[in-house]
Amino acid sequence: MATLPQVVQAVDMPVIAAGGIGSGQAIAAAECLGACGVQIGTLFLAAEECAISEAYRQQVIDAGDQDTIVTGISTGGRVRSVASPFLAELLADELKGLDPKVFLERTQGSYGRAIAGEIDQGTIQAGEVAGQVKAKSTAKAIIDRLVAEYQETVAKFQS
């Protein structure tokens, strides 16, 4: 959110806020900072309609607010994921100077493996709001909750 007002001021087009949007309050905050809309990803990993394995979904649901890490620093293709022994080892090697080509070889197909349920050698991509995901739900229920939280937040500021 720190860069959102800067982007809004710097460009002459609608701005969509993304990253860290996990509640109706965050949607209201993005709007206050000048965004005309938001993109939400991680929350919908818990949706029944999301085509991921139950193992992937459960890892996101079980994640706490400090349970994500960023890998891909050496390649310029940074990815935030739920921490795992596989990714912790990869990140440690990366910080020691792992060759980017070796990194790419070790991670080739890891996202697909996670989606298929092979989470031990998979990359369970999820944002920092993973800790706010508490249970499996429907996409409609997630949207309904976000709308209610947003409306409640806006009403507080209008009174």
Question: Where are the regions that the model predicts?
Answer:
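Conserved active-site-proximal phosphate/metal-binding subdomains
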Residues: M1-D12, I16, G22-S159
